[in-house]
């Protein structure tokens, strides 16, 4: 009898404790009655806030969700711009669950993988579509303004689709290819994130960089531009050097011509002065002038070596008359 009472007491205690459940801060919960979501009298889903709550054991079960703001780090490679440039974008998305019933029905027992996959897929598609109409300059100036605002608004746009028809089934014993294809088709069928009970709070582009191929192309283009600039300056330098050389040669020729002209003028003036002095001096002594000129002629004749000199003795020769003076 005691054993029966003890067993009954244990069952009562277990039953009593299974009647209560606790929702922690930052969480929300819904009641599943025989695996189906329970509603109130107004056919609204019962969402339980943090605190201690009561349920029917073995009939009702609790599904708890994270109600905090969650962040997805996302990276997009090869995003093509309007001017055909490939960019690499590092982005992040802040989101939270705002409709726990939709979220449960859509993601299949709070499978966060499907939710994040869908959020990233929709965000990436819209971001690529937006960037394809902008060049790099417009993207940089619109990163914190219209670009992210448009994407956020489009992701949160309301839809008239019946969310109860959008249900992801979770494979218990592994995931078959058929289930994966069904899930991918469902992902494509959802036009905005409100259909799965998710709200996008903020989207941001943290970093914009170029792909490796585009970076190499930029470096090659910069090198080509600098080589062209260097070649241009070298050509300008060679041209200026040639102009300076021609100008210097012209100045040299001009200065030399001027100097030679001055020298010739001075020389001619000096010769004229000497001739005048000789003329004035010899006009006073014509015989002495004739004697000096004859001596100069003798010097020019007799100073030559290795030559035979034949002298014709003529007493009446005016050239040799000073050689016969006794």
UniProtKB/Swiss-Prot annotation:
Record carries keyword Protease: no
GO CC, alphabetical: membrane
Top-level taxon: Bacteria
Record key words, sorted: Membrane, Transmembrane, Transmembrane helix
Subcellular location: Membrane
SMART domains referenced in this protein's UniProt entry, alphabetically: PHB
Residue intervals passing through the bilayer: 4-24
Any Pfam family the entry gives: Band_7
Topology class, membrane: Single-pass membrane protein
Function statement: HflC and HflK could regulate a protease.
Subunit composition and interactions: HflC and HflK may interact to form a multimeric complex.
Similarity annotation: Belongs to the band 7/mec-2 family. HflC subfamily.
Protein name: Protein HflC
């Amino acid at each position: 009898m005691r054993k029966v009472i003890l067993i009954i007491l244990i069952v009562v205690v277990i039953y009593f404790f299974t009647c209560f459940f606790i929702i922690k801060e930052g969480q929300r919960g819904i009641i599943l009655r025989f695996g189906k979501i329970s509603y109130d009298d107004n056919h609204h889903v019962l969402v339980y806030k943090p605190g201690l709550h009561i349920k029917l054991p073995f009939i009702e079960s609790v599904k708890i969700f994270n109600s905090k703001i969650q962040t997805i780090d996302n990276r997009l490679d090869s995003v093509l711009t309007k001017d055909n440039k490939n960019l690499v974008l590092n982005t992040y998305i802040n989101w939270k669950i705002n409709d726990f019933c939709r979220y449960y029905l859509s993601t299949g027992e709070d499978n966060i993988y499907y939710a994040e996959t869908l959020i990233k897929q929709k965000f990436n598609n819209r971001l690529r579509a937006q960037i394809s109409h902008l060049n790099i300059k417009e993207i940089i100036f619109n990163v914190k303004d219209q670009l992210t605002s448009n994407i956020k608004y489009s992701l949160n746009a309301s839809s008239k689709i019946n969310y109860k028809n959008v249900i992801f089934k979770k494979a218990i014993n592994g995931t078959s290819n058929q289930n994966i294809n069904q899930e991918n088709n469902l992902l494509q069928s959802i036009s905005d994130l409100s259909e799965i009970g998710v709200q996008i709070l903020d989207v941001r582009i943290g970093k914009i960089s170029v792909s490796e191929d585009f970076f190499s192309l930029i470096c090659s283009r910069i090198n080509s531009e600098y080589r062209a600039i260097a070649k241009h300056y070298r050509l300008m330098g060679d041209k200026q050097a040639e102009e300076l050389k021609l100008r210097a040669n012209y100045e040299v020729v001009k200065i030399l011509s001027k100097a030679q002209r001055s020298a010739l003028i001075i020389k001619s003036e000096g010769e004229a002065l000497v001739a005048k002095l000789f003329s004035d001096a010899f006009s006073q002594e014509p015989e002495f002038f004739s004697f000096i000129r004859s001596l100069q002629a003798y010097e020019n004749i007799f100073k030559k070596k290795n030559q035979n000199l034949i002298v014709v003795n003529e007493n009446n020769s005016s050239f040799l008359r000073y050689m016969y003076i006794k």
